[in-house]
């Protein structure tokens, strides 16, 4: 068995069955079952769901949406990712799988916005997310680091 990796989840009935394993493990607000069912009904082929399989079973998952700031009062301008929900099955928690999912999202090199749910503020702090407070509520933001050593085409000419 190879090392687990993050992969985009297919929108199908197999994934729906895998999501049912998470029902009752976490908070209702983290449930993605209804979200997946809606995507199956709409025959949406662009899955917003990502997960980690271990031993053939889904053990961790997140939903990730591409958004564009349309004047909302927070620190992100332009295109960003909203990491809407992240959940790891209890048996596999505190083994780095949640961090693997977040690092996958970070690797896409867009700012990320997320809401800290279920006493997870320490997790987001550890992963260098910054807390942001606005009238609508609190959330966390991560910005990709600018590579100061990058050379543009104009500079190299």
Swiss-Prot record:
One of its GO terms (molecular function) is acyltransferase activity, transferring groups other than amino-acyl groups. It comes from Bacillus cereus (strain AH187). This is Uncharacterized N-acetyltransferase BCAH187_A3974. NCBIfam families: PRK13688.1 (NF010241). It comes from the Bacteria. The lineage of its organism: Bacteria, Bacillati, Bacillota, Bacilli, Bacillales. Its EC number is 2.3.1.-. It holds the Pfam family Acetyltransf_1. Keywords: Acyltransferase, Transferase. Residues 9-146 form the N-acetyltransferase domain.
